[in-house]
């Protein structure tokens, strides 16, 4: 009777459905878990493996499942995170904003400050990298009566002249301490791209100039469409990644009996100190 408990009912009509993401796919694209197969060759007991030989699924789904389960997987075969580049770019943008919000007098060419140093890279168990902000960086302090000071400045002649400025060059900002000339050129090109023409300017132009403006406008529309397409593809990949993670987490809780290193108590989920590798 004890042996009968180990039998699993297999539906022979679900050959085209992935057992991890539960999505239907083309016939012949599913296979058994290659990660569990490699672990079994290395000597890992079959009782501790997450997937049996009867389960079929996508190769990427099995790899992501094992990454979440924190079992051993070679770095060469581990799929990189699809949104790793997005997180890195966002961290760099936030660092630039914080750098500009700080006291600009303390950041000079002679004393560039601590922001010129290399960013600290934190390595996770999944061989990923993320940027960690400097712990000893200066934090900008804001006066409690900043609204009153702003109103006083705006009433003065100097404040009015500053409000009349529309660009960074007119304000006298120039280049940021950590900004490259290439970034400035990209920002200026975006400003020129979004600058429109008035009706009077268009009336003074001839047909050839209007034709050139029309071609430039079509090129700008094409570039914007390509940028939007890239953003939509990134959004779809993030949605797929999130869906696979949710499914994997649910199955991890269902198969917690097969994971001896996972202890579930009243206080919550606690991982043991020595995970199975």
Curated annotation (Swiss-Prot):
It holds the Pfam family EURL. InterPro entries: EURL_prot (IPR009704). Residues 197-229 form a coiled coil. Residues 173-201 are annotated as: Disordered. It comes from the Eukaryota. One of its GO terms (biological process) is positive regulation of dendritic spine development. Belongs to the EURL family. Plays a role in cortical progenitor cell proliferation and differentiation. May promote dendritic spine development of post-migratory cortical projection neurons by modulating the beta-catenin signaling pathway. This is Protein EURL homolog. It comes from Danio rerio (Zebrafish). The lineage of its organism: Eukaryota, Metazoa, Chordata, Craniata, Vertebrata. The gene is eurl.
